[in-house]
Curated annotation (Swiss-Prot):
Subcellular location as annotated: Secreted
Molecular function GO terms recorded: potassium channel regulator activity; toxin activity
Disulfide bonds: 32-58, 41-57, 44-67
Signal sequence annotation: 1-23
A cellular component annotation (GO) from this entry: extracellular region
Tissues and organs where the protein is expressed, per its UniProt entry: Expressed by the venom gland.
Protein name: Kappa-scoloptoxin(03)-Ssm1b
Keywords carried by this UniProt record: Disulfide bond, Ion channel impairing toxin, Neurotoxin, Potassium channel impairing toxin, Secreted, Signal, Toxin, Voltage-gated potassium channel impairing toxin
Post-translational modification: Contains 3 disulfide bonds.
Superkingdom: Eukaryota
Function: Inhibits voltage-gated potassium channels.
Protein's organism: Scolopendra mutilans (Chinese red-headed centipede)
């Protein structure tokens, strides 16, 4: 095997292992790392026609509180 091929193989293995370790530790965005907030935001995002509702619910307290009101009624 040529040295350049060996170097490329090692680089590919390093990138693959780093990608796996980072993707395994993905957490929900914003404040939705907390399961208490994540579940209502998911439920409201499925009911909403707004494309980025989940991210807004996780980020903004006013949207989250509105979501809770919708789920209560």
């Amino acid at each position: 095997m040529k040295p350049s091929m060996a170097i490329l193989l090692v680089i590919a293995l390093i990138i693959f292992s780093l990608d796996k370790s980072y993707s395994a530790n993905d957490k929900p965005i914003g404040k939705c790392g907390d399961a208490k907030r994540n579940k209502p935001c998911l439920a409201c995002s499925h009911r909403s026609s707004i494309a980025d509702f989940y991210s807004k619910c996780c980020t903004y307290d006013a949207v989250y509180n509105g979501c809770l009101d919708k789920l209560r009624h």
